[in-house]
Amino acid sequence: GSFVNPTTPIR
C-alpha cells in the first residue's frame, strides 16, 4: 500500500 512497503494491502 505504501511506497516503502508495497506489500501492504490498501483498505
From Swiss-Prot:
Q: Which cofactor does it need?
A: Cu cation
Key words, A-Z: Cell membrane, Copper, Glycoprotein, GPI-anchor, Lipoprotein, Membrane, Metal-binding
Location of the protein in the cell:
Cell membrane
Signal peptide span per the entry?
none
UniProt membrane topology term? Lipid-anchor; GPI-anchor
- The lineage's top-level taxon is Eukaryota
Task: Please classify the protein's predominant subcellular localization into one broad category.
Answer: membrane
Annotated Gene Ontology cellular component terms: plasma membrane; side of membrane
Q: Which GO terms describe its molecular function?
A: metal ion binding
> Which family would the database say this protein is a member of?
Belongs to the multicopper oxidase family.
Q: What is this protein called?
A: Monocopper oxidase-like protein 1
Q: Which organism is it from?
A: Zinnia elegans
What is this organism's lineage?
Answer: Eukaryota, Viridiplantae, Streptophyta, Embryophyta, Tracheophyta
